[in-house]
Amino acid sequence: MASGKATGKTDAPAPVIKLGGPKPPKVGSSGNASWFQAIKAKKLNSHPPKFEGSGVPDNENLKTSQQHGYWRRQARFKPVKGGRKPVPDAWYFYYTGTGPAADLNWGDSQDGIVWVAAKGADVKSRSHQGTRDPDKFDQYPLRFSDGGPDGNFRWDFIPLNRGRSGRSTAASSAASSRAPSRDGSRGRRSGSEDDLIARAAKIIQDQQKKGSRITKVKADEMAHRRYCKRTIPPGYKVDQVFGPRTKGKEGNFGDDKMNEEGIKDGRVTAMLNLVPSSHACLFGSRVTPKLQPDGLHLKFEFTTVVPRDDPQFDNYVKICDQCVDGVGTRPKDDEPRPKSRSSSRPATRTSSPAPRQQRPKKEKKPKKQDDEVDKALTSNEERNNAQLEFDEEPKVINWGDSALGENEL
C-alpha cells in the first residue's frame, strides 16, 4: 500500500518561504532539510567545494567535538518552455548521522558527498542535532569563522534577523513570531551592528556586479542627492550636476570640453585619482566651520602632493592648466566635432567649424577662419587623448577602488 509518509522523504530541501531567524536548536526535528542555507556553484559541472578552513558552518550551540558533518550535492533546474534546464548545483550541509546520508559514517566515500570537520571534532560520534522542519524553522545564515568555500562557489549574504527584500540577500524579520524562550537567547549583535553588516554586504555585492547598467532613475538620484554626495552619471554634463563653471571661486574646475563630456572626458578619471577620500578629507583637511543665516558652512582645505618624479606629473600639470578657471576655453588641440544627431538648439556662432551633415566629404573644409580648426582629428590629438586617459602604462597608476566614491560607509 502506498503511504502518504513516503512523500516526506525527499533529498531536496523543502521550499523555504522565510529565511533567517533563530539559531538551530539543540534538539532535532522531524524534517529532513539542512539547517543552513546552501552554497551554490558558479558554473555547471563544477568540482566539489574545497574550503579554506574546516568547512563546518559556525554554530555556537554545539561543542567543538560535535562540529563535523558533510556537504551534499543537490542538482537544480529551472523551468523553461517545453521542459527544464539545469543550473549550477547547490550544496547543503548536514551533521554526521543526519540528513539524506544519515546511514554513512564520517569519511565514507560516496559521490556528491564532501566530509568536513573542525579541529578537535570527534568524527566517530554521531550527531543528535537532527535536521530542519521547514514549517517550524527557517534556514540559518552561513558563517565561516575560519574560511569558507573556494572561489568557484558563492552564497547569499543573509544578516542575522534581518528582513528580505527582493532576491535572497537578507533574512526574514519574522523573529517577533518566534517563541519567547528562544528570543531571549538569540542575537548577540545590536541592531546597529546588523545594519552595518547589511550595508557592507550590499556594497560588496554591488561592486561585484560587472557590467551593470545605470537606470534613468538611478542616474537622476546620483545627480540630485545632497550636493556633497553627488556624482556625475553617464550622459550628464558637469553643470547639470554641480552648476555652471566659474572663475576664481568654488566650481572653478573644468573647461568647456570637460563640461560637455562629463565623465567621458579621460581627464576626469585622471584627476579623480588625486581627489581625497571622505576619510582623508575629514581627518586630513583644515576644517573651518562657520555659522551663516542659511545654516552651518563647513570648509575643507586639503592638499594633494604629486611628486615631480611621478610618471604622469606633466599630464597632471597640463590638465590643471587647462581646467582650473577653464570656463569658456577648450584644449588647444581640441575642436568640437559635428554632432551625429540633431540638436534642439540651433547654432548661433557665425564661425561654426564644420558645415552641417558633412560625412561623405571629409576633405571639404570651412573657409579659413580659424587655423586651429584645421588641426582637428590629427595624430597629435589622438596621442594627447591617449596620454590623458593613461592607457599606455596602466600598471604605473592606481586609480583606486572606487574613484567616484559611491560606495562609502
Curated annotation (Swiss-Prot):
Biased composition (Low complexity): 15-31, 164-179, 341-357
Gene: N
Function comment: Packages the positive strand viral genome RNA into a helical ribonucleocapsid (RNP) and plays a fundamental role during virion assembly through its interactions with the viral genome and membrane protein M. Plays an important role in enhancing the efficiency of subgenomic viral RNA transcription as well as viral replication.
Keyword tags: ADP-ribosylation, Disulfide bond, Host Golgi apparatus, Phosphoprotein, Ribonucleoprotein, RNA-binding, Transcription, Transcription regulation, Viral nucleoprotein, Virion
Protein name: Nucleoprotein
Main location: virion
Region annotated RNA-binding, chain positions: 29-160
Positions of the UniProt region annotated as Disordered: 1-32, 45-69, 122-145, 164-194, 238-259, 326-409
Disulfide pattern: C320-C323
Compositional bias ranges of the Basic residues kind: 358-367
One example GO MF annotation: RNA binding
Domain CoV N NTD: 31-156
GO cellular component: host cell endoplasmic reticulum-Golgi intermediate compartment; host cell Golgi apparatus; ribonucleoprotein complex; viral nucleocapsid
Pfam families named in the record: CoV_nucleocap (PF00937)
Chain spans, region Dimerization: 226-333
Phosphothreonine modification, residue list: T378
Biased composition (Basic and acidic residues): 122-138, 180-192, 247-259
PTM per Swiss-Prot/TrEMBL: ADP-ribosylated. The ADP-ribosylation is retained in the virion during infection.
Organism: Avian infectious bronchitis virus (strain Arkansas 99)
